Amino acid sequence: MKKIILLGATGSIGTQTLAIIRENPEKFQIVALSFGRNMERGRAIIKEFKPKMVAVWHTRDRVILEAEFPNVKFFNGLEGLREVATYLDGDVLLNAVMGSVGLLPTLDAIEAGKAIAIANKETLVTAGHLVMRAAKEKNISLLPVDSEHSAILQALNGENTERIEKLVLTASGGSFRDKTREQLSEVTVKEALKHPNWNMGNKLTIDSATMFNKGLEVMEAHWLFGVDYDDIEVVIQRESIIHSMVQFVDGSFIAQLGTPDMRMPIQYALTYPDRLYIPYEKEFRITDFSALHFEKVDYERFPALKLAYNAGKIGGTMPTVLNAANEIAVAGFLNGQVAFYNIEALVENAMNRHTSISDPDLDTILQVDQETRAYVKTLL
């Protein structure tokens, strides 16, 4: 039985992870977890899964829960996340928190010898060189939870990675894929949160609409698979049936197909290289799709993706700036402070004023992250 530490238990990935564990109690046990502010959902999870250790964000929530669950050890804040991530009894850390707050817990878990299932792409975006170096030194497996990277991992199974011609990441195009740049000036938060194919959290859904999410995934793929940015291509695949592909030097492609359901890559990360049965409401049949559609990305329509490629190629602290600026800009949009079409402009502004620092250490990354957030907040 694998003992799981789950960071971000009440979020979209966390909820679907718990569904898998609920279906397979003989294979998995939740021994520690974290959640943010959703106390009602968090209480229910603690009651059902009976973790031994829990981290919440606020001190007041920790105090309340300590009184309700005297047999559980509680922590709070970033230090709480770090405590939970290194819980001695855990085998696998599944990091499903949103944002760069996931970086330090991941590094701590690697140092503690945990296997890592990574859904927190910001960890690799901001500090991929540090994370991959630490994982290599500790001989730790780093398995992707994102559907695109899981698809690539499956396509590469047994293949010689030196024979890769390029990686092809697929994208749905998000909520506004059929709108022009001019039409984006009037879109609302409610409209932006209606993703055509996937059920995701708010921040991730907005990132999908701007294509910043795909940009972060390009950087994640660069680190996970050691492929140059010029050899990573993004294409629009409207149906979200082909989750990603690998092209090899002989011109052949290997793709992974399936229903757009995050339980598939989650279970693969937890069971790799094995697989589990997943009960779907509707069986996936390839014959239900008379055609699959592919489109080139229009970088004028989706400037966020171009910014992400530029940040990745510049390297150093520039990806940290892009990520931090985007997190603040998206929060501003969700709170009604920023128009949707201004999200990219805020990120570009932050990148233009920053001189990248090459091969940054952890302290430098954290400092640049905080400085960028503070700067972008002044622009809201």
From Swiss-Prot:
Its EC number is 1.1.1.267. Its cofactor is Mg(2+); Mn(2+). GO terms for molecular function: 1-deoxy-D-xylulose-5-phosphate reductoisomerase activity; manganese ion binding; NADPH binding. NADPH binds at T10, G11, S12, I13, G36, R37, N38, N120, E122, G201. Mn(2+) binds at D146, E148, E217. It holds the Pfam family DXPR_C. It comes from the Bacteria. It catalyses: 2-C-methyl-D-erythritol 4-phosphate + NADP(+) = 1-deoxy-D-xylulose 5-phosphate + NADPH + H(+). GO terms for biological process: isopentenyl diphosphate biosynthetic process, methylerythritol 4-phosphate pathway involved in terpenoid biosynthetic process. Pathway: Isoprenoid biosynthesis; isopentenyl diphosphate biosynthesis via DXP pathway; isopentenyl diphosphate from 1-deoxy-D-xylulose 5-phosphate: step 1/6. Keywords: Isoprene biosynthesis, Manganese, Metal-binding, NADP, Oxidoreductase. The keyword NADP applies. The keyword Chaperone does not apply. InterPro entries: DXP_reductoisomerase, DXP_reductoisomerase_C, DXP_reductoisomerase_N, DXPR_C, DXPR_C_sf, NAD(P)-bd_dom_sf. 1-deoxy-D-xylulose 5-phosphate binds at K121, S147, E148, S172, H195, S208, N213, K214, E217. Belongs to the DXR family. Catalyzes the NADPH-dependent rearrangement and reduction of 1-deoxy-D-xylulose-5-phosphate (DXP) to 2-C-methyl-D-erythritol 4-phosphate (MEP). NCBIfam families: Dxr, PRK12464.1. This is 1-deoxy-D-xylulose 5-phosphate reductoisomerase. The lineage of its organism: Bacteria, Bacillati, Bacillota, Bacilli, Bacillales.
